[in-house]
Amino acid sequence: MSDRLTLLRPDDWHIHLRDGAVLPHTVADVARTFGRAIIMPNLVPPVRNAQQADAYRQRILAARPAGSRFEPLMVLYLTDQTTPEDIRTAKASGFVHAAKLYPAGATTNSDSGVTSIDKIFPALEAMAEVGMLLLVHGEVTRGEIDVFDREKVFIDEHLRRVVERFPTLKVVFEHITTGEAVQFVNEASANVAATITAHHLLYNRNHMLVGGIRPHFYCLPILKRNTHQASLLDAATSGSGKFFLGTDSAPHAQHAKENACGCAGCYTAYAAIELYAEAFEQRNALDKLEGFASLHGPAFYGLPANQDTITLVRDEWTAPASLPFGELTVIPLRAGEKLRWRLEEHA
């Protein structure tokens, strides 16, 4: 087995960079590895139109390390009030590549999200017409639905209806976590794809709950049982172009995670491709990593693949115990633990 793995430079099709003083830290971490990233719009207030997306994009570009060519791909935050004109203006900008459906209350900063799917049908119709992708956080939020079942129920109650109603709309089912989601994507048309996180490939709910509650494993959608983890590994390593890399790296300050009511999100951007390599190596599928990380996403988005490369080397190193996060700190996933692959840094 080779101790070096060279890939076309990957992209991250789902990341949270946050805003303000933390941007120099979060942008540096993603730009170290990825050529482009789909930037989540769930700021406070959210990124609802092309003008706000451009302002956020400029802040991200200003935070890039010297010499970086990292490109942020912007996303609109759908609300009940999003209009077809909002969609057309965003598409015409050239820098907004998708719009994001957050069911209201489903995750961090989703309170302004969609309260009823039917309310955004005019916007979805416009998206289908102009070729803008729909990104979906696929969980219902009704209190009587068990948190471990919310993805499956969303598929049955909402997602099937959306893809049937808008067959030409390209849909990315983001950060899928269940066997049911894998099956849905596999059986859907070529216009439906999914992203998978490194933490959902490497971990299941036992890692979060057995032997004590580990808040840095807490994310939404929540980690599921190991049978679902196995389904995700099958999908990611299958070679299917329907599945591609999206870290959902979502930093929160240490005090907000280590809390009686801790925030949801795992910070993986600092070592994302290294973590994915571990997952693919578990399945003896390192030969499938380039497709998943570097090729399938651009193809689905209608963009060219990156032309430069990165190299991973099998060289054990210890993840930092904490990382700077503005004036605070963030605890990364695997803090203080050994990682088996290291990104080779070029001078």
From Swiss-Prot:
Active site (record annotation): 248
Amino acids binding substrate: 16-18, 42, 137, 220, 252, 264
Keyword Hydrolase listed: yes
Cofactor note: Binds 2 Zn(2+) ions per subunit.
PROSITE patterns: DIHYDROOROTASE_1, DIHYDROOROTASE_2
Record text on subunit structure and interactions: Homodimer.
Family per similarity comment: Belongs to the metallo-dependent hydrolases superfamily. DHOase family. Class II DHOase subfamily.
Name of the protein in question: Dihydroorotase
Species of origin: Pseudomonas savastanoi pv. phaseolicola (strain 1448A / Race 6) (Pseudomonas syringae pv. phaseolicola (strain 1448A / Race 6))
Taxon lineage: Bacteria, Pseudomonadati, Pseudomonadota, Gammaproteobacteria, Pseudomonadales
